[in-house]
């Protein structure tokens, strides 16, 4: 409960700071709000991607360790399969980071990208 409250207060304060930092013209205000919310969205997407990858990696390692404990002769094969699976799991976090970087730095939603 405290984490949810802290997250909501952080989001509200970042929006309020973006609101007060903009100039008096409505175009500058809209631009500041847009880029502020884009930064928040990028951070949330990276966080959720890392959360999913962490949960998946933990589950994969737990399963491999249980298999190695049950049958120590299969430890080498299980370890190889686990490392391949971990490589695939980590791609989710990397894709989340890649999409966030693309959205923030290319201006794809602001019309600057030429699409």
UniProtKB/Swiss-Prot annotation:
Key words of the record: ATP synthesis, Cell inner membrane, Cell membrane, CF(0), Hydrogen ion transport, Ion transport, Lipid-binding, Membrane, Transmembrane, Transmembrane helix, Transport
Gene3D superfamilies reported for this sequence: F1F0 ATP synthase subunit C
Major localisation: membrane
Record-marked site positions (Reversibly protonated during proton transport): 90
Domain of life: Bacteria
GO molecular function (one): lipid binding
PROSITE patterns assigned to the protein according to its UniProt record, in alphabetical order: ATPASE_C (PS00605)
Subcellular location: Cell inner membrane
TM annotation in the entry: 32-52, 83-103
SUPFAM superfamilies named among the record's database cross-references: F1F0 ATP synthase subunit C
A Pfam match: ATP-synt_C
Membrane topology: Multi-pass membrane protein
Gene Ontology CC entries for this record: plasma membrane; proton-transporting ATP synthase complex; proton-transporting two-sector ATPase complex, proton-transporting domain
Keyword Cell inner membrane: yes
Known function: F(1)F(0) ATP synthase produces ATP from ADP in the presence of a proton or sodium gradient. F-type ATPases consist of two structural domains, F(1) containing the extramembraneous catalytic core and F(0) containing the membrane proton channel, linked together by a central stalk and a peripheral stalk. During catalysis, ATP synthesis in the catalytic domain of F(1) is coupled via a rotary mechanism of the central stalk subunits to proton translocation.
Complex and partners: F-type ATPases have 2 components, F(1) - the catalytic core - and F(0) - the membrane proton channel. F(1) has five subunits: alpha(3), beta(3), gamma(1), delta(1), epsilon(1). F(0) has three main subunits: a(1), b(2) and c(10-14). The alpha and beta chains form an alternating ring which encloses part of the gamma chain. F(1) is attached to F(0) by a central stalk formed by the gamma and epsilon chains, while a peripheral stalk is formed by the delta and b chains.
Family (UniProt): Belongs to the ATPase C chain family.
Protein name: ATP synthase subunit c
Species assigned in the record: Hydrogenobaculum sp. (strain Y04AAS1)
Classification lineage: Bacteria, Pseudomonadati, Aquificota, Aquificia, Aquificales
Gene from which the chain derives: atpE
